[in-house]
Amino acid sequence: MKFYEYSAKEIFRAEGISTPRGGVAETPEEAERIAAELGCDVAVKSQVLTGGRGKAGGIRFASPSGVAEVTGDLLSSEVRGETVEKVLIEEKIPIDRELYVSAVIDRTAKMPLIMASAEGGVDIEELAARSPEKIVRYHINPLDEFLPYEAREIARKMGLESELIPSVGGVIWKLYQLFRKYDARLAEINPLVISGDSVIAADAKLEVDDDSIYRHREFMEMEEYEPEEFAFVKLDGDIAVIGNGAGLTLTAMDLIKLNGEPATFLDIGGGASEDVIRRALDLVISHPSVRVVFLNVLGGITRADDVARGVVNALRDARRDVPLVIRLTGTNEEEGQRILREAGIPFETSLERAAEKAVEIAKNL
């Protein structure tokens, strides 16, 4: 479960991490009122769950008199394929220095990892590739307590001046405490701003493990929460893989991996209805990194004609045009293939050929 920035900052503040003053607006009038109350120039920040807002024009600055116009421009615009419905209006804080700090799960080491850098406000992946020595990495045994002196040691290894070590170390310690408390997969501050004597989380990211939501029922009341209906994992590639059954989906992913990179694992399960197919396609198409969708269905209790109708409806209402490669065989396959053929949607019956086609399309885009 990913949190909007304003929601993440509410949690960060509750755990003692300072954030800029501000409020959420859904209209230009609300933005104008918030800016007037702040009485200073403001940052207008699109509230979307995708990354890279700044580069995509989703963060702008305005005076109190100009905030309504800027907000109007951002609302209903799209940032990396996601529609902006709210903006966060925050005081524009003077920046002396930008740092980076995060807590994540290191799946290779099978333990939490603190990452910190004296260079904040940049893409951490780019920094890791360009200057890996500038990132401090500190693994934490999940059976041990993370003590304040350890957080201060991380701040010291960042190369900070001695007067900053207690305050920055304090933020690192608090960030890890909320990371553990809320069963997070990611808790990130980028940038962590030094502004005079203050240390402020200018941005906040929080992603909580979906399997832990039952322990945090307050999250079920939040707009970010979506009840889980698929076995879904977001990956780093550009080819979304959907299948009916974990084995079929993993097999399709293995074939994609021969020459390409999967963007998702999505198992719709057995007996998937027309509506489930439509929602599954809607979900993967909503991710901006997805350039091709590979749907692999071997009909058993899942009927090929239901799958075909779901595909037709999903493509008719899709928010963006993404190439779709379908492998469709099994129960009612003749009817399903007829529906696709009449809708002008190509399909394959060979799994290997379908996977090759998906990779080929992705490489030529």
Curated annotation (Swiss-Prot):
GO terms for biological process: succinyl-CoA metabolic process; tricarboxylic acid cycle. Residues 9-230 form the ATP-grasp domain. Its cofactor is Mg(2+). It catalyses: succinate + ATP + CoA = succinyl-CoA + ADP + phosphate; GTP + succinate + CoA = succinyl-CoA + GDP + phosphate. Pfam families: ATP-grasp_2, Ligase_CoA. It is an enzyme of class 6 (ligase). Keywords: ATP-binding, Ligase, Magnesium, Metal-binding, Nucleotide-binding, Tricarboxylic acid cycle. InterPro entries: ATP-grasp (IPR011761), ATP-grasp_succ-CoA_synth-type (IPR013650), ATP_grasp_subdomain_1 (IPR013815), Succ-CoA_synthase_bsu_CS (IPR017866), SUCC_ACL_C (IPR005811), Succ_CoA_ligase-like_bsu (IPR005809), Succinyl-CoA_synth-like (IPR016102). One of its GO terms (cellular component) is succinate-CoA ligase complex. PROSITE patterns: ATP_GRASP (PS50975), SUCCINYL_COA_LIG_3 (PS01217). Pathway: Carbohydrate metabolism; tricarboxylic acid cycle; succinate from succinyl-CoA (ligase route): step 1/1. Succinyl-CoA synthetase functions in the citric acid cycle (TCA), coupling the hydrolysis of succinyl-CoA to the synthesis of either ATP or GTP and thus represents the only step of substrate-level phosphorylation in the TCA. The beta subunit provides nucleotide specificity of the enzyme and binds the substrate succinate, while the binding sites for coenzyme A and phosphate are found in the alpha subunit. Belongs to the succinate/malate CoA ligase beta subunit family. This is Succinate--CoA ligase [ADP-forming] subunit beta.
